[in-house]
Amino acid sequence: MFATVRRYEGIDASDKAELTKKVSESLAPRLSKLPGFSSYFLIDTGNGVMSSIGLFDTSTQANESTRVASEWVRDEKLENILQNPPKVTEGEVIVHKMNGLVKA
């Protein structure tokens, strides 16, 4: 399993609700259709920072999710909300333990 972590900085508090809605309604469904998709999480870490974690079967699939997310930002015209490029980290998940998740 491979993870992609994207950290978005400089998000105005007044834009978080709109961004969250758009991610839920259009990005998450788009990512879930990618081959090898396992799960996706969007995290509000506070202070104008939001991070996402995507889990995929292979490194290539995880990398593709970053391309799809970048394309989505352009398609949704979110450059004004996401003014700074994300800091992207990808790698193999080497420890994983999960109990049942509660939907946010």
Regions found by a protein language model. Give the residues of each.
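Short S/T/G/P-rich N-terminal loop/turn motif that feeds into the first structured element of a domain
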Residues: 1-51, 57-71, 78-104
